[in-house]
Every structure is written in C-alpha cells, then in structure tokens.
Amino acid sequence: MKKLLALFVIAPILISCTSNKNSEYREEYIKDTNGFDILMGQFAHNIENIWGLHEVLIAGPKDYVKYTDQYRTRSHINFEAGTITIETISPIDPTTYLRKAIITTLLMGDDPGSVDLYSDTNDIQISKEPFLYGQVMDNNGQPIRWEWRATHFADYLIANKLQKRQSGLHVIWSVTIQLVPNHLDKRAHKYLPLIRQASIKYGIDESLILAIMQIESSFNPYAVSRSDALGLMQVVQHTAGRDVFKMKGKSGQPSRSYLFDPENNIDAGTAYLSILQNSYLVDITNATSRRYAVITAYNGGAGSVLRVFSSDKKKAAQIINKMAPGDVYETLTTKHPSAESRRYLMKVNTAQKGYHH
C-alpha cells in the first residue's frame, strides 16, 4: 500500500505578492497560502479519484513525482530511498505507457523550470546529458545516456521485472529500479562547481552548503515543499528570497523559475546563509556557536533561535557568548520550540561532518 505523502507542493499559479508594505505583504501572502492549500487539496482529491484511496502520491523535497496519460501513469523517484518506481493504471495496453514513462524518466534533463509536476502534460525533454546518468545502471551494468540503451532497458524491465497489484478497483502495473548505492554522492558531485563558486563568493564553508542541500532535498533539483520552499536548497521566495534580493539591491522576490535554476538556487541559499552569519547572528562571537545558530536559523528563522536564550536579541547574543559551543548545541537541540528545527540542527551537523576532508 502506498503511503499518503504530505502535500509537499507549490502551485505554479500562485500569485506573487509585490507589495512594499509589510502589513499588506503579509495579508496578501496569507491569501496566497490559503489559495494554495485549497488548490493542493483539490489536486490530491483528483489524484485520489483517479488512483483510489491510499494511492495519492505528490512531489516533495526528496520525491520527484510526474503524472502523464491523463494522470493514469506516474514516475516516482525517491531520492532518499534511492528508488525509481514507474506505475500505471491504464486499462488499455499498460506496458506501452510504462515503457514510455521508463524511457522518459531515465533520459530527463535537470531543468526543473521546464517541467510542470502538477499537470499530466508530457513536457519532459529527453536530454543528451540525463539527470540520472551514472545514478542508474542497466541490466548489463552500463550507465544510460542514449535512447537506444534506455529503450533496451525498459524492454528488459517489462519482460523480467513487471509487477502487478490490486488496489481498490484498479490493477496497478509497475516496475521498480534501484539507483546505484552512491547515488547521493553522484548527485552532489554534479553541483560541486556551483557550490565552490558560491562558497568563495559568500565566505560559507562548502561542507555546510553540501550538508544543507543533502538534508533539504537530497540534491533533488525538482524539490518542492508545502512551506513554499523551492529547489536544491529549499529557498522560500517570500522570506529568504526577499532578503537575498534586498542584499543584491533588487526589489521584490525571486520567481519560481529563478529558484528552480540550480545555479540561482545555490547562490540564493548560500547568500542567505551569509546574511544569517554576517548580519542577523553576527553578534555571536564563537564561530562554532554561530554555525549552530545559523544552521537552526536556516530552518526556523534567526529570531526564533535568539528567543531560545532571551526575548532581547542583544541579551541573547551575550548569553550565547558566555556559553561553551557544546552547551549552545545542547540548548538548541532540546529547548528550541520547533521539533523540526531541533532535529534539523542534529541532521545538518551530522551530515556536515561527512563532507569534511
């Protein structure tokens, strides 16, 4: 039985708020968020109507989900588990739809801005540099770059690995493909030049950028989230995005297409880390303590980090500066009001250790 994924999505038709007045902006954002919740509720309801109860599957930070064939065929890449599952409930010639979806998924590029994950439009372009190249091996142990190899592998999977299950009124046909064991490192490697560029530009440690990308999206450039966070570093348009644009002397906030571009996303996410480090949390003098604060703030905001120690920002920094870094870590991972932020610091800190040379 498929688990019901949380609605980690962002509607492409949401209206961007451009008011310069904070109160007006917040009011408009609330309206947009409410509209988004309604739209996504409808989207999930439509998927449930087509696929049935317990079969709702929607894109998230670490899950690529694309529907085609009037929403009767879908491709799901679970970047955390390292699996690709292609499924169809098409009552007529299901293997034809599976075959096409397998080939398209294996050969898709890494341009999220060109793909609408919330429609059944077959808008995925076959790329000469497939996003999954090197992350999947065919039945002969070869990486898949060309259409002929993807086609042969699709035929092999349908002939040898085809699964069938009953779910409600539907027969679901599927094949599952395992990513290579080091798929996470393969994806991370693709973005190293951009990470190094941003690291030098903003003075942020490469290992921290890598760790945040791993925890936020598992290096999934198609990453979306219910909190309106987009792309590899899960940048939120109306908060971090606005701060970064302001720092760059730009008005407003970045668009969805801007943040779905990997270079822009890594630049914006790293720029926001630098704002946290060099502006919002600059009064924390110990580098390790400040790093813990920056990591937690990337998830839950700088204000909530400081309020753990005092309602007065200056006093909070003074209190932190009198504490050992280990005590700051302990406090943030046990006293922060958000359980998500508490876990986030633990996860990113652990992941960062894995990227130190």
From Swiss-Prot:
<dbReference type="GO" id="GO:0008933">
    <property type="term" value="F:peptidoglycan lytic transglycosylase activity"/>
</dbReference>
<protein>
    <recommendedName>
        <fullName>Membrane-bound lytic murein transglycosylase C</fullName>
        <ecNumber>4.2.2.n1</ecNumber>
    </recommendedName>
</protein>
<dbReference type="InterPro" id="IPR023346">
    <property type="entry name" value="Lysozyme-like_dom_sf"/>
</dbReference>
<dbReference type="Pfam" id="PF01464">
    <property type="entry name" value="SLT"/>
</dbReference>
<comment type="similarity">
    <text>Belongs to the transglycosylase Slt family.</text>
</comment>
<dbReference type="GO" id="GO:0000270">
    <property type="term" value="P:peptidoglycan metabolic process"/>
</dbReference>
<keyword id="KW-0564">Palmitate</keyword>
<dbReference type="InterPro" id="IPR000189">
    <property type="entry name" value="Transglyc_AS"/>
</dbReference>
<keyword id="KW-0456">Lyase</keyword>
<dbReference type="GO" id="GO:0009279">
    <property type="term" value="C:cell outer membrane"/>
</dbReference>
<dbReference type="InterPro" id="IPR023664">
    <property type="entry name" value="Murein_transglycosylaseC"/>
</dbReference>
<feature type="signal peptide">
    <location>
        <begin position="1"/>
        <end position="16"/>
    </location>
</feature>
<keyword id="KW-0961">Cell wall biogenesis/degradation</keyword>
<dbReference type="GO" id="GO:0071555">
    <property type="term" value="P:cell wall organization"/>
</dbReference>
<dbReference type="GO" id="GO:0016798">
    <property type="term" value="F:hydrolase activity, acting on glycosyl bonds"/>
</dbReference>
<keyword id="KW-0998">Cell outer membrane</keyword>
<keyword id="KW-0449">Lipoprotein</keyword>
<feature type="lipid moiety-binding region" description="S-diacylglycerol cysteine">
    <location>
        <position position="17"/>
    </location>
</feature>
<dbReference type="InterPro" id="IPR024570">
    <property type="entry name" value="Murein_transglycosylaseC_N"/>
</dbReference>
<dbReference type="GO" id="GO:0016998">
    <property type="term" value="P:cell wall macromolecule catabolic process"/>
</dbReference>
<dbReference type="InterPro" id="IPR008258">
    <property type="entry name" value="Transglycosylase_SLT_dom_1"/>
</dbReference>
<keyword id="KW-0472">Membrane</keyword>
<comment type="function">
    <text>Murein-degrading enzyme. May play a role in recycling of muropeptides during cell elongation and/or cell division.</text>
</comment>
<keyword id="KW-0732">Signal</keyword>
<feature type="lipid moiety-binding region" description="N-palmitoyl cysteine">
    <location>
        <position position="17"/>
    </location>
</feature>
<dbReference type="Pfam" id="PF11873">
    <property type="entry name" value="Mltc_N"/>
</dbReference>
